[in-house]
Amino acid sequence: MLSEDLATSFLPPSYMWSLTLFALCLSAILMFPFLTGRRLSITHRKQGWRISLVNTRGDFQNEAEQLIRMGFSKSPSAFRMSTDGGPRLILSQKHLDAMSDDDHFNVAEAVKRDYLLDLFGFETAFHGTLHSEIVAPAVTAMTKKLVPLVPLMSKEAALGLEKEWTDNSEYHDVPLQPTLGGVVARLASLAFVGPDLCRNPTWLEITVSYTINRVIAVYVLRIFPSFLQPFVHWVLPPCRKLRAQIQQARELILPALKHERQLQSAGNAKRDPNRPFSSLAWNDEYAAGRLYDPTVAQLRMIFVSIHTTIDMAVKVLVRLCEHPELIQPLREEIVTVCGENGLTHSSLERLLLMDSLMKETQRLEPASLATIARYTHRKTTLSDGTIVPKGTQVVLPNMFMWNNESIYPDSNTFDAYRFLRMRDDPETAKLASFTRSSHIHTAFGHGKHTCPGRFFASDTIKIILCHILLKYDLQLCDGEAPAKKRYGFAMYRDPDARIRVRRRGVEGVSEGILAGF
């Protein structure tokens, strides 16, 4: 009795209610195998019945690649396994074309189910669906504006690196992911929300952290059965943090949008062509008076673009630190290509060794083991007779990119020149570009649902690499490369990793190029 009095006197009612709800949810989880009569452990080692759901998810989170290999060793075409998002049908690479059939395999529904879009604060379409549909055309429009955007992005990269890495000519440690994240956020924000907001510290923090916070919230919610998720998300701290951050973003976006609208007032039907492109203004013009949520539209663009670009930039920088012999050839390429006209969209396209380095890094370290996910709206029979029931969530892993000698000789070996050599072969030249998706490289997806932002991501990373390579020397800390990490399907480098950098002296043609950066 005394302990109960102490608990109720020191804990607020809302906290006690949360604890009670948590206890009920935990009970539901432990009882879930009894209630459903379904075991989710399919390819996993056998687990005890009491926590089979939690254990199988734990196996997936820690050993996803090994489990997929195990599954394909038993069933080379397709098999079922459990993930932290529920059961999935895993298909082999030979079914890639079949998954491009929208009549049978739906992308939007897979995304909706994976990222819980029906929950308030998880990009819910409560004001209509325009802000969700607008992302792809907005990114396409932004891609068409890369020619005038690149010089502006280059100036932003210079400012960002000076802030994050300083001009210190002595070697000093820098945290890799946060500093590159800050630079990527500035470049992306310039194109997303325009020059007036792209240096706002609060907005930049949202830009970098929103996706991470959202992923954390989804992972926490996945602990609970789906029928409880619409209730528990209201009280779970990661979900509450996400909703608070969306409101914080709204307080920045709406005044910026009001300013954009004022620029178009006084009878101006079209936007000033001399004002830099921003998806914020473009979205509003595209909406043409239709109801939409401009904040959610921007956060959707952030969610699908920023974190993957930061992840890719980090991995490329790590590879350069691991292979310092690549740095001088890359510097020479930049000087040769950019020597006449400076850093432009056209010159970025001609940085072929850099392009090959990026594509090879992505081949071995994509953002995910499985970038292609679909949901079936009807029963489907594949070419080899495999039956995919209606309502199945389907995944196609990328592992063939580093585990198939018939596609890539020495497939487990990093070779920065691999795709540069492919350009010399007429049969493979068209597959060599970093932005090209194909049957042998699916890191950006495949078919008409290939990532539309890959061109912008490519230019962003190349701009940053040009500035880094010409302005800084790089070293690993204590000779140790940042560790490769896995969590479920996610593949990333240690987010706490640091490297050593110093500002280098530049002379001759390099100095001339930098003057135009």
Swiss-Prot record:
Transmembrane regions listed in the UniProt entry: 15-35
Catalytic activity: 3-hydroxypentacecilide A + NADPH + O2 + H(+) = chrodrimanin F + NADP(+) + H2O; chrodrimanin C + NADPH + O2 + H(+) = chrodrimanin H + NADP(+) + H2O; verruculide A + NADPH + O2 + H(+) = chrodrimanin E + NADP(+) + H2O; chrodrimanin T + NADPH + O2 + H(+) = chrodrimanin A + NADP(+) + H2O
Sample GO molecular function, one term: iron ion binding
Pfam families: p450
GO BP: secondary metabolic process; terpenoid biosynthetic process
Entry-listed glycosylation sites: N404
Binding site for heme: C451
tRNA-binding is among the record's keywords: no
Keywords: Glycoprotein, Heme, Iron, Membrane, Metal-binding, Monooxygenase, Oxidoreductase, Transmembrane, Transmembrane helix
Record SUPFAM superfamilies: Cytochrome P450
Biotech uses: Compounds in the chrodrimanin family such as chrodrimanin A or verruculide A exhibit strong inhibitory activities against protein tyrosine phosphatase 1B (PTP1B) and therefore, they could potentially be developed into drugs for the treatment of type 2 diabetes or obesity. Furthermore, chrodrimanin B, the end product of the pathway involving chrodrimanin A or verruculide A, does not exhibit the PTP1B inhibitory activity, while it functions as a potent blocker of insect GABA-gated chloride channels.
E.C. numbers: 1.-.-.-
Cofactor(s) the record lists: heme
Metabolic or biological pathway, per its Swiss-Prot or TrEMBL entry: Secondary metabolite biosynthesis; terpenoid biosynthesis
GO cellular component: membrane
Functional note: Cytochrome P450 monooxygenase; part of the gene cluster that mediates the biosynthesis of chrodrimanin B, a meroterpenoid that acts as a potent blocker of insect GABA-gated chloride channels. The first step of the pathway is the biosynthesis of 6-hydroxymellein by the polyketide synthase cdmE. The prenyltransferase cdmH acts as a 6-hydroxymellein 5-farnesyltransferase and produces the hydrophobic metabolite verruculide C. The FAD-dependent monooxygenase cdmI further converts verruculide C into verruculide B.
The family this protein is said to belong to: Belongs to the cytochrome P450 family.
The name this protein goes by in its record: Cytochrome P450 monooxygenase cdmJ
Originating species: Talaromyces verruculosus (Penicillium verruculosum)
Lineage: Eukaryota, Fungi, Dikarya, Ascomycota, Pezizomycotina
